[in-house]
Amino acid sequence: MTTMTEQSVQVYAVFIRATAEQVWEAITKPEFTTKYFYGSLIDSTYEPGTPYTGWSTDRSQQYVDGEVIEASPPARLVTSWRAMYDEEAAAEPYSRVTWELEPAGEGVTKLTVVHDQLEGSPKTAANVAGGWSFVLSGMKTLLETGKPLSG
């Protein structure tokens, strides 16, 4: 996994032994996200302009608030992002998350996540700096083994 961590732009990339369609499902289906995304149930219709939200599995706590900016299955998803799990981060401006999927050989997909527009959001930048590596490692493990990385 490659990582570039700066205050305003963070880039993470991983190669996953799965098709782009399988990776897209893992990104967009809550039955997958709860197994690798810190237990978050990601909820969206993935139509531009619609909400993109992350919840605890019982929906008692909202973790992420955002909106779908662009969705081009199974190649690209762009959302706005505001962390709701931390009071200081929730007060910061929205940032942007871009998921890019590209074939990297037969049955292999390169997944790149770019989290940017973090200017003026130091708490969010610090929170997600370690988080994305864990999320992508969890997704890779789940898709390649059928088992979650932790828990």
Model-identified regions with their sequence ranges:
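A short, structured loop/turn motif at beta-sheet edges
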Residues: 20-21, 69-76, 100-110
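Beta-strand/loop substructures that line and gate deep hydrophobic ligand-binding cavities in soluble
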Residues: 86-133, 151
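Hydrophobic pocket/interface hotspot
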Residues: 23-24, 33, 52, 68, ...
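Short beta-edge strand/loop motif at the mouth of beta-sheet-based domains
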Residues: 11-12, 31-63, 76
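A generic structural micro-feature
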Residues: 4-8, 58-62, 89-93, 105-107
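Short, highly charged C-terminal tails/helix-capping segments
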Residues: 141-151
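Hydrophobic/aromatic beta-strand elements that line small-molecule binding cavities or substrate pockets
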Residues: 13-14, 64-70, 95-103
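Hydrophobic ligand-binding cavity/cleft-lining segments
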Residues: 1-43
